[in-house]
Amino acid sequence: MIKKLLTNRVASICLLILGAFTLAGIFAPVIAPHDPNLSDFTKFFAPISWEFPLGADHLGRCILSRLIFGIRTTLFYAFFTMLITLSVSTVIGIISGNIGGKIDNFIMRTCDILLSFPSEVMVLSLIGILGPGITSIIIANFIAKLPWYVRMIRSSVIRFNHQNYVLYSNTIETRFRYKLFRHFFPNIASEIAILASMDIGWVILSISTLSFLGLGVALPTPEWGAMLSEAKDVLLTNPEQMMYPGVTIMIVVATCNLLGDSMRELFDPKERA
């Protein structure tokens, strides 16, 4: 899959951008010029300089350093949310599509109930119940996205259940774990990857939006949405304070969406047709 992605120019550029952000987040203590929470009231709203490559905020903190460390609390939490969502939904979807019967009916009716609520309404409702915080955001986004993936994976499993190699495995009573990793997962991996790459952008926007509203990451932890919230009071006098985190969010979300579109063109037979 990776080799095929690298043959597409847009996908290669998107992977390069996401890889650069990921590496910057991992090595943030080395790359960032300052401690992201270090305040210097003698340098508030400092202009761009060698000391502050993107200037300083209202507390004299380095904006570039906070953007770099913000990768950990925005992008990495989005990756983690999608990872647990995909892991759980893959297992549930394959079990539902492979076993059928009352278990399948119960899982599907539960998904129907969850899907009857708009994702944004469900996320806000769950955070209202669980309380603000990044843990609540991860749980809320996980529950909001889980039924979508369970239904998609289940339908794919049902489609592959009628293939000869799956029927043969059922005939000789092959272990479920073998069928999971040998038959089902390789066939649905591309579909999962396409949806996940586009939904990462949605999760990033969700984390940033909720942090902007004060329901996410607690200050002074650097996070892109929280940085936007802090900068909104000086929008007219120092618009660059909102521009830097806003443009960063736009670049990452657009990159994820373009990567998803490129993967769909490469791996979806309907798109190729």
Each model region followed by its residue ranges:
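Transmembrane-helix boundary motif in ABC transporter permease subunits
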Residues: 28-31, 78-112, 124
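C-terminal transmembrane helix and the adjacent membrane-cytosol boundary/short C-terminal tail
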Residues: 143-144, 190, 194-200, 239-273
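Generic hydrophobic transmembrane alpha-helix motif, especially the helices
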Residues: 53, 57, 97-98, 103, ...
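Membrane-cytosol interface at the C-terminal ends of specific transmembrane alpha-helices
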Residues: 82, 90, 94, 132-182, ...
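N-terminal signal-anchor/first transmembrane alpha helix
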Residues: 1-34, 110, 188
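Periplasmic/extracellular loop-to-transmembrane helix junction in inner-membrane transport proteins
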Residues: 1-4, 34-82, 229-246
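Non-cytoplasmic
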Residues: 124-125, 129, 133-145, 192-227
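Short helix-to-coil transition segments within interhelical loops
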Residues: 56-61, 98-99, 168-187, 228
